[in-house]
UniProtKB/Swiss-Prot annotation:
Gene Ontology CC: one annotated term: cytosol
The protein's name: Adenosylhomocysteinase
Binding annotation for NAD(+): 206-208, 240, 269-274, 292, 327, 348-350, 397
Family according to the record: Belongs to the adenosylhomocysteinase family.
Cofactor notes: Binds 1 NAD(+) per subunit.
Binding partners and assembly: Homotetramer.
Entries under SMART domains matching the protein: AdoHcyase, AdoHcyase_NAD
Catalytic activity: S-adenosyl-L-homocysteine + H2O = L-homocysteine + adenosine
HAMAP family with a match to the protein in the record: AdoHcyase (MF_00563)
Protein function: Adenosylhomocysteine is a competitive inhibitor of S-adenosyl-L-methionine-dependent methyl transferase reactions; therefore adenosylhomocysteinase may play a key role in the control of methylations via regulation of the intracellular concentration of adenosylhomocysteine.
CDD domains the UniProt entry points to: SAHH (cd00401)
Length: 485
């Protein structure tokens, strides 16, 4: 693949769409800083002591303006950083340009091919002589996956001389991963094992990536400690819920200009992301229907006045379909064939396998009409009617809009900084084994507290008598570990 790394005048590596967009990115970054009090508080509290001095951090997370503030928080605390996006459509090119010019090595641009995406991921992990990163900030688990698959292939190659065969899988993306690893064996047959030996740990941002980590922990194949940032309350109950409540209608309207009021909208899944999406559509005037497998989540939806049906019940009646499950094969091509003309189909889960894009793309005689970037009308030959698919089945709020707003991302990214600090500060203590951990409650509460002042909140304080009565410390933590917010 004919891609090459470029360098700034200071020698920093990068590959972005257009470095001349850096000034624009810097202006938006400065606006975002005001809306991200948690990250700015981290700079104030930890910056003087430079706790990340000597640390190499690789990040695979949407290269947005908000992520730019996270990156510059990590560098302000002393880290060296290399970054790529975790989605081919989610990068904001002006944000990538600003960071590449001013702060860190970035390999990201909006509209990457899958080959380019994995090239960027490989570059993000490549620190040259001396192995890879000390720490990983991951979103969806692709950087973690590449290292695990690389180590597995190197061990097999050393034992038997066998190299990965890209044709051994039907998954087109995994073919690319195996090709990268196979080609890497020719130049360095221990590259990923050297990365593994150096790695202190990973902090994972999203539900999908966390599932991967727990699967590896269960199978005994997890190679390094991991902190599950997603299940911090100040992440899942804010980013996943309120972030999606904001960004789903933003993406829908930017992509289609459709009026949501009066439409029938189907939300597949009613976890935190699904709850935010359903609330947004309901507030916009849609008649919302939810599909669910979990009776508890289904009952929650019913208590909100939302009908629970199967996709088959409503596929020919609804106007908007949103997948939020984190699972595969939710909306299949046979469902899409039965939809009404110009029904909108989109996904706000991390990967592109919730909607059967392969089945749609290979359907005999189907015609794809690109209306604008990330907005395509697919016309079926039998009916001459079509559906509108957003962001090619990938994250529509980042593919068709700019994702979640800065304030809610400050909550998530403050958790990331704290998780990275926790891993780095405890690297020699043995506190963290090759398992998945969640940040303790007092740190979760600290993240929330850092964001209250921006909104003008004033907390009530327990008296000593009240504290003794309910056996809760005056300064917290205020809830038990299993409390459900």
């Amino acid at each position: 693949m004919a891609l090459s790394v470029e360098k700034t005048s200071s020698g920093r590596e990068y590959k972005v769409k257009d470095l001349f967009q850096a000034d624009f990115g810097r202006l938006e970054l400065e606006l975002a800083e005001v809306e991200m009090p948690g990250l700015m508080a981290c700079r104030t509290e930890f910056g003087p002591s430079q706790p990340f001095k000597g640390a190499r951090i690789s990040g695979s997370l949407h290269m947005t303006i908000q992520t730019a503030v996270l990156i510059e928080t990590l560098t302000a605390l002393g880290a060296e950083v290399r970054w790529c996006s975790c989605n081919i459509f989610s990068s904001q090119d002006h944000a990538a340009a600003a960071i590449a010019r001013d702060s860190a090595a970035v390999f990201a641009w909006k509209g990457e091919t899958l080959e380019e995406y994995w090239w960027c991921t490989e570059r993000c992990l490549d620190w040259g002589v001396g192995g890879g990163p000390d720490l990983i900030v991951d979103d969806g688990g692709d950087a973690t996956l590449l290292i695990h698959e690389g180590v597995k292939a190197e061990e097999e190659f050393e034992k038997s001389g066998k190299v990965p065969d890209p044709e051994s899988t039907d998954n087109p993306e995994f073919k690319i991963v195996l090709t990268i690893i196979r080609d890497g064996l020719k130049t360095d047959a221990s590259k990923y094992r050297k990365m593994k030996e150096r790695l202190v740990g990973v902090s994972e941002e999203t539900t999908t990536g966390v599932k991967r980590l727990y699967q590896m922990q269960e199978s005994g194949t997890l190679l390094f400690p991991a902190i599950n940032v997603n299940d911090s309350v100040t992440k899942s109950k804010f980013d996943n819920l309120y972030g999606c409540r904001h960004s789903l209608p933003d993406g829908l309207m930017r992509a289609t200009d459709v009026m949501i009021a009066g439409k029938v909208a189907v939300v597949c899944g009613y976890g935190d992301v699904g709850k935010g999406c359903a609330a947004a559509l309901k507030q916009a005037g849609a008649r919302v229907i939810v599909t669910e497998i979990d009776p508890i989540c289904a009952l929650q939806a019913l208590m909100e006045g939302i009908q629970i049906l199967t996709l088959e019940d409503v596929v020919s009646e609804a106007d908007i379909f949103v997948t939020t499950t984190g699972n595969k094969d939710i909306i299949m091509v046979d469902h899409m064939r039965k939809m009404k003309n110009n029904a909108i189909v989109c996904n706000i889960g991390h990967f592109d396998n919730e909607i059967d894009m392969n089945g749609l793309e290979t359907y005999p005689g189907v015609k794809r009409i690109t209306i604008k970037p990330q907005t395509d009308r697919w016309v079926f030959p039998e009916t001459k009617t079509g559906i509108i698919v957003l962001a090619e089945g990938r994250l529509m709020n980042l593919g068709c809009a700019t994702g979640h707003p800065s304030f809610v991302m400050s909550c998530s990214f403050t958790n990331q900084v704290i998780a990275q600090l926790e891993l780095w500060n405890e690297k020699a203590s043995g506190k963290y084994e090759k398992k998945v951990y969640v940040l303790p409650k007092h740190l979760d509460e600290k993240v929330a507290a850092l964001h209250l002042g921006k909104l003008g909140a004033r907390l009530t304080k327990l008296t000593k008598s009240q504290s003794d009565y309910i056996s809760i410390p005056i300064e917290g933590p205020y809830k038990l570990r299993l409390y459900r917010y």
